C-alpha cells in the first residue's frame, strides 16, 4: 500500500491498484489524501504530456513545503486517467509496504 509521508505525517495512502503511476510519479486518488495538510498555491505549470498542473503547499506543524503537491484537474487526453489525482515531490517520500 503506497503512502506519501512528509515530516512524519502520512499525507496520502491508497491500495496499490488505486494509484496511478505516470512518468515515475505516484498519483493518489483525491479521497485517499488528507487535505487538512494541503493549502492551495497560486502556482501553475504546463506539461506537454499532461497539461496544466495546479499546486498545493504541504503544511505540517507550521512547516511549509511550498508547491510540494500537484494535480491536473483537466489533463490532456494522453493522461486523462489522472484527472484530480494528487502527486507529491520536494522531499515528500513515497513508502510502500512489503
Language-model regions, residue ranges each:
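Terminal leader/tail segments of proteins
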Residues: 1-98
Amino acid at each position: 500500500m503506497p503512502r506519501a509521508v512528509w515530516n512524519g505525517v502520512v499525507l496520502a495512502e491508497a491500495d496499490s491498484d488505486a494509484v496511478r503511476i505516470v512518468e515515475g510519479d505516484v498519483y493518489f486518488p483525491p479521497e485517499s489524501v488528507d487535505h487538512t495538510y494541503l493549502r492551495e498555491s497560486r502556482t501553475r505549470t504546463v506539461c506537454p504530456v499532461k497539461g496544466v498542473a495546479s499546486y498545493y503547499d504541504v503544511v505540517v506543524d507550521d512547516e511549509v513545503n511550498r508547491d510540494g503537491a500537484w494535480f491536473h484537474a483537466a489533463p490532456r487526453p494522453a493522461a486523462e486517467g489522472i484527472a484530480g489525482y494528487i502527486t507529491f515531490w520536494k522531499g515528500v517520500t513515497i513508502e510502500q509496504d512489503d
